[in-house]
A protein has these predicted regions:
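C-terminal catalytic domains of large/alpha subunits in multi-subunit enzymes
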Residues: 67-68, 214-219, 249-256, 285, ...
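Short acidic, glycine/serine/threonine-rich loops at helix termini
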Residues: 74-78, 109-112, 206-208, 231-237, ...
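Short, aliphatic-rich beta-strand segments
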Residues: 35, 193-197, 456-461, 619-621
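Glycine-rich loop/linker segments at domain edges
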Residues: 6, 12-18, 143-184, 274-359, ...
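Thiamine diphosphate
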Residues: 207, 230-253, 257-259, 470-478
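Flexible, low-hydrophobicity surface segments
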Residues: 1-146, 164-167, 251
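Helix-loop-helix junctions that connect adjacent transmembrane helices in secondary transporters/permeases
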Residues: 133-213, 379-456, 589, 665-679, ...
Length: 745
């Protein structure tokens, strides 16, 4: 087992707590204009005309722009348009953008923009959207992706089963819910567009803005200001906002800002995909799983964002961390006239894990086994073949479950405490890491180190610091390899003019991709210095970097002196690390493959207390066990788990951004019930270093695993307490109250 690394103070902590960090909404520019989107008020229809004269005549207005004012491309096929040209596909689509001297003036003028439409039939359910007579959002139909996974023969497996459980599950939309509002500033400067945008993928923003403005990418520079969280947001939304502000900036020649209120986020912003899942599983009397069959429908909303990768992932993970010989999974994603859905924390895992772990509990119950015993019997082990056909290695699911049993306690029987129903539930994690074979891009990341004459380092990477502590992680990795304290290492914000494209801070890939690239960059820096010392200073043998010193046997010098030797050789003072993920593949004909380069494993336990009168559910205890491979920063990892649990609690119990009839249920954060600190119980986090992670650092990601199985652990506890299965999220007051009332009849 690897030695646990020390806790590391975040490199941005002081600036954030003292208010020195500048977020996009804090940036000040002379002559700045404020922009406001005009939103459609129907879910589907033809846009016949937009009337802007009254808005243009309003006080303080500098311009009003429609899709006809976009000089370049209005994004890609089936992607969310910057502004609607001729067809409205979702309530909240952008019809026009107003630019004015103040936000108040922009808001007033936006209300003066009117438009003519011809309503069209709409569809709001993904299963209905795939029927032959459903209203079509696009000429080629409503199907986004059909993903099938097959192993063995499901019918044979069900014939072998003594017990079969069939259940139907539904999950809801939720928002990413970052504390910082979406905001962007675009400023024409020195013949280029400067874009100040908190985002997950700055190079994607550059691509979108350049295409919209008809400019080469070299004429658009995206710089990331301080960022207050993402959780799957600040991606597609950031691109649309940046493009709208850029179009206004191009036309006016002035800096333009766009900042969303929470009502705009709820109306137009990206949400988690709702799933409708039919799940069937069979087992023998001794508890052996024999077959799993899943049919799932994924609501992608009106536009293409991350629906393909979400649907693909959910199909791969549908069998959970369990050994089963016969599998038949079919997941279909469809366009609907709802708001579009994207890569909200976990994208696909939380939805399918809710179904899988619920059915595993029910199978155990019908077989008279404990949830522990049933899972232990069926957990994957090294050498097994997963449900999607991948040979498994470094499987630590069993170690995680056993540690959870020790920490949480073995007794899962429901009981009554102070007049309240108390249930205890568990869930197991099996999550593919990073992009996987379902994403048609090679997963890569780069980090560059510049060695300065005073022995300090400038580090750059295109992978965004979204608030998770990524820069602290890179500082720790480089500092440990070169023997330097954090104050000698400066990591610049992502800047497309000076960093290499390293993909998106998504899919829990930051630690794996940028972390490994940073380690490789540090090795190259050491090799350059070592070569100089061997050739020019007579060092002979291994060289050690520690505490700001460079040692070789009895020889010793400061790191600064060693850098000076390198400088005097005339060699490059830069080191670059480039990391590429191991190849994955998917056989579309056989419906199986080597799907992800590695898998994250974990197990969670939840205790839930339910008031039998009101139906209110409170999580009173939560234990999260995760295998990290190797822990780089213990404190940051514990923090990620705590945040992930809080997001999972909201997903399980309160949050709901569903859109009945295309109208978002919650209009603002007063009616969208995010959990607060008062709604959270203490989270007991246990971090293991069992299974080997991704080399060379041997690490696993944690951002999304921390959330993925929280909801099923909670709902399994609630189902035990209520004596009835929770099959719909959120398990809110109304849901619980209905179960309690039904049991009284």
């Amino acid at each position: 087992m690897a030695q646990r690394e020390q806790d590391i103070l975040r490199v941005d902590a002081r600036d954030k707590v003292t208010g020195r960090t500048k977020y996009a909404a804090d940036l000040v520019f002379d002559g700045i204009l404020y922009t406001k989107s005009v939103h459609a008020d129907l879910p589907h229809g033809k846009l016949l005309a937009v009337h802007t004269a009254a808005a243009l005549a309003a006080e303080g207005v500098a311009g009003v722009y429609t899709a006809r004012d976009i000089p370049g491309r209005n994004v890609g096929d089936n992607e969310k348009p910057i502004m609607v040209y001729d067809t409205i596909r979702s309530r909240g689509d952008c019809i026009a953008v107003v630019a004015a001297v103040s936000q108040e003036a922009a808001d007033r003028a936006a209300r003066l923009v009117t438009y003519d439409t011809q309503p069209m039939p709409a569809v709001f359910d993904p299963e209905e959207a795939l029927l032959p007579d459903a209203p079509k959002l696009y000429d080629d139909g409503n199907l986004i992706l059909e993903h099938r996974v097959r192993k063995g023969w499901a019918a044979k497996g069900f014939d072998e089963a003594d017990i079969i459980v069939e259940r139907e599950f539904r999950t809801q939309r939720v928002i990413p819910g970052a504390i910082e509002p979406e905001s962007v500033v675009v400023s024409p400067q020195d013949g280029e567009l400067r874009v100040y945008c908190p985002c997950k993928a700055p190079f994607n923003i550059r691509r979108i803005v350049a295409a919209a403005c008809g400019l080469p990418m070299s004429a658009v520079r995206v710089t990331q200001p301080g960022m207050g969280g993402s959780f799957g947001g600040k991606d597609d939304d950031a691109g649309a906002m940046a493009a709208r502000a850029a179009i206004a900036a191009l036309h006016t020649g002035r800096p333009c800002r766009m900042t969303w209120r929470s009502s705009e986020t709820l109306l137009e912003g990206v949400k988690r995909h709702p799933f409708h899942i039919y799940y069937k599983a069979g087992a023998k009397r001794d508890g052996t799983l024999t077959a799993i069959e899943v049919r799932g429908f994924v609501d992608g909303g009106a536009y293409l964002s991350k629906s393909k990768t979400t649907t693909w992932r959910s199909g791969i993970e549908a069998t959970g961390p369990y050994r089963v010989e016969h599998v038949d999974v079919c997941m279909k994603a469809a366009y609907t006239n709802n708001c579009y859905a994207g890569s909200v924390r976990g994208f696909g895992s939380p939805q399918i894990d809710f179904a899988t772990e619920s059915v595993m509990d029910e199978l155990a119950q019908q077989l008279g086994m404990t949830p522990w015993a049933f899972r232990e019997k069926n957990l994957l082990r090294d050498g097994d073949i997963s449900g999607s056909g991948q040979p498994m290695r470094d499987v630590s699911a069993g170690a995680c479950l056993e540690r959870l049993r020790r920490e949480f306690g073995e007794d899962l029987r429901p009981f009554v405490r102070n007049g309240k129903l108390v249930g205890r539930g568990i869930a197991c994690l099996y999550r593919g890491e990073s992009y996987g074979a379902g994403t048609p891009v090679q997963d890569t990341s780069g980090v560059t180190i510049v060695l300065n004459a005073d022995g300090s380092l400038n580090v750059s990477t295109g992978l965004s610091e979204v608030g998770q502590g990524g820069h602290t992680l890179l500082t720790a990795i480089i500092g440990r390899e070169l023997g330097l304290p954090p104050e000698r290492i400066h990591i610049a914000p992502a800047d497309t003019d000076y960093c290499v494209d390293s993909g998106s801070t998504a899919a829990s890939r930051g630690t794996i991709t940028a972390g490994n690239a940073a380690w490789l960059a540090a090795q190259e820096a050491k090799q350059q210095i070592n070569t100089a010392l061997w050739e020019y200073r007579g060092f002979d043998g291994p060289i050690v970097y520690e505490d700001g010193l460079v040692r070789c046997g009895d020889e010793q010098m400061t790191f600064t002196e060693a850098v000076g030797v390198l400088r005097n050789t005339g060699r490059d003072m830069r080191a670059h690390g480039w990391w590429a993920a191991p190849k994955t593949f998917w056989d579309r004909e056989k419906c199986r493959g080597s799907n992800y380069m590695s898998y994250a494993y974990g197990a969670c336990g939840a205790e839930v207390e339910i008031d039998p009168i009101t139906g209110k559910a409170d999580v009173t205890d939560f234990v999260a066990v995760h295998d990290m491979g190797r822990i780089i920063n213990h404190a940051a990892t514990v923090g990620q788990v705590g945040g992930g649990v809080s997001m999972g609690v909201g997903y399980a119990l309160t949050e709901n951004a569903d859109t009945p009839g295309g109208v978002t249920r919650a209009a603002d954060l007063d009616s969208y019930l995010l959990p607060t600190a008062l709604d959270m119980c203490p989270v007991r986090t246990v971090l293991l270093e069992e299974g080997a992670g991704v080399p060379p650092l041997l690490v696993h990601g944690i951002g999304e695993p921390a959330t993925s199985i929280v909801a099923p652990a909670i709902t399994n506890a609630m189902s035990a307490a209520l004596g009835a299965r929770i099959d719909t999220l959120p398990a809110d007051l109304e849901t619980v109250r209905a179960i309690l009332d039904e049991k009284k009849r």
